[in-house]
A protein has these predicted regions:
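Polybasic, low-complexity intrinsically disordered segments
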Residues: 2-5, 10-54
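Patatin-like phospholipase
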Residues: 52, 56-104, 112-354
């Protein structure tokens, strides 16, 4: 049942909402002090889900500056997006409106949050939300719902009065074009979802879930009879510049989740992987092909930079992995990303002409 913390005689950040499982026996003042300190964790308060705001009280950030002729391209990377979500928050704070956004995997979540003009959801999705006990764990993986429980993370929490309510009305009102990429398990081919595919919020969220479905860690997602996994297995290895190119763009602001000198290594035991994926052989081949595709895309980005056709944000460091669940580390990654965004802002302005 929902309990408004502001009804209690304990000072906490506002607005804030706590959900307790029915029958939970907790010392409520101690709980509120823990919330105030920011140390509510899965282990300390397992039945708790923090909802940092009510959607009805949230106002979308205005877009005041149009970016002409440049597409925004958002790489995936799971929880590494804690670092790069700061880039989106910074752009929203500046009111920058790109005409086109392409996102894959975690980048698809950033795409939706950016178009809905929601900096708070952008930040929380890859930081504090990881403390939610229903986010996923070994138990949910063994139960067949995935190490990250995709249905809960992407579809359930976006609903009103849930952990991360999504402003679908603002999203629909936007004129920005976008593409979200996923990979078909049948042939390993790339599928691009656009605004025309998303008549309802669940249409959007299930496609973000499909784009973010890590093979082996999350079960495939079926949409209209077609089964999908992570879009990072597609043609460019997870950097969806091809989505923007399909819509005619030749100038890009690319946000990567790996440092500039990163090179993706080949799969060590391809035959073992083929055996593990014997029921979906195209997925195995896409995983095996991904390092070469990814490295080729990074080389293409370097060429585009040299030609003045791309600005690429590379993290100076990457302190978290794609499966990180420690909120303190995720917050630190976000802070590092924001510090880098602030430092690079003058270069952004020069490239974008704003």
């Amino acid at each position: 049942f929902p309990l408004r913390v502001d009804d209690l005689d304990v000072p906490v950040p506002q607005p804030f909402q706590v959900f307790l499982d029915e029958g939970t026996d907790l010392n409520l003042p101690d709980l509120c002090r823990a919330v105030t300190r920011g140390d509510v964790t899965r282990s300390s308060h397992a039945p708790i889900i923090a909802c940092p705001r009510q959607l009805t009280t949230w106002q979308a950030r205005p877009m005041t500056t149009s970016i002409d002729g440049t597409a925004l391209v958002l790489e995936g990377g799971g929880m590494r997006a804690a670092y790069t979500s700061a880039v989106i928050v910074k752009m929203l704070g500046l009111g920058w409106k790109f005409p086109h956004v392409s996102g894959i995997s975690a980048g698809s979540s950033l795409t939706a949050n950016y178009i809905s003009r929601d900096p708070e959801r952008t930040r929380l999705s890859f930081t504090d939300f990881a403390a939610d006990p229903r986010f996923g764990n070994l138990g949910t993986w063994l139960a067949g719902r995935g190490y990250f429980d995709g249905e809960y993370i992407y579809q359930r929490t976006a609903e009103p009065h849930q952990a991360l309510p999504f402003d679908f009305l603002t999203f629909c009102a936007s004129s920005q074009a976008f593409r979200i990429g996923a990979t078909r398990t049948s042939d390993g081919g790339q599928e691009w979802f656009t605004r025309e595919d998303m008549k309802t919020m669940d249409d959007l969220m299930v496609r973000i879930r499909a784009s973010s479905t890590m093979p082996g860690f999350m079960p495939p997602v079926t949409i209209e009879g077609v089964e999908y996994v992570d879009g990072a297995l597609g043609d460019t290895g997870g950097i969806p510049i091809d989505g923007a190119q399909l819509d005619g763009y030749d100038r890009f602001f690319v946000v990567c989740t790996r440092p500039r000198d990163y090179i993706k290594n080949e799969v060590k035991r391809p035959q073992t992987l083929r055996r593990l994926c014997r029921h979906r052989p195209a997925v195995a081949e896409a995983i095996i092909a991904r390092p070469a595709r990814y490295n080729a895309t990074r080389e293409m980005l370097r060429d585009l930079e040299s030609d003045g056709k791309a600005y690429v944000f590379y993290p100076r460091v990457m302190p978290v992995t794609n499966k990180e669940r420690n909120v303190t580390k995720l917050r630190q990654a976000y802070a590092l990303g924001m510090a880098q965004a602030n430092a690079e802002l003058p270069q952004w302005r020069v490239f974008l002409g704003v």
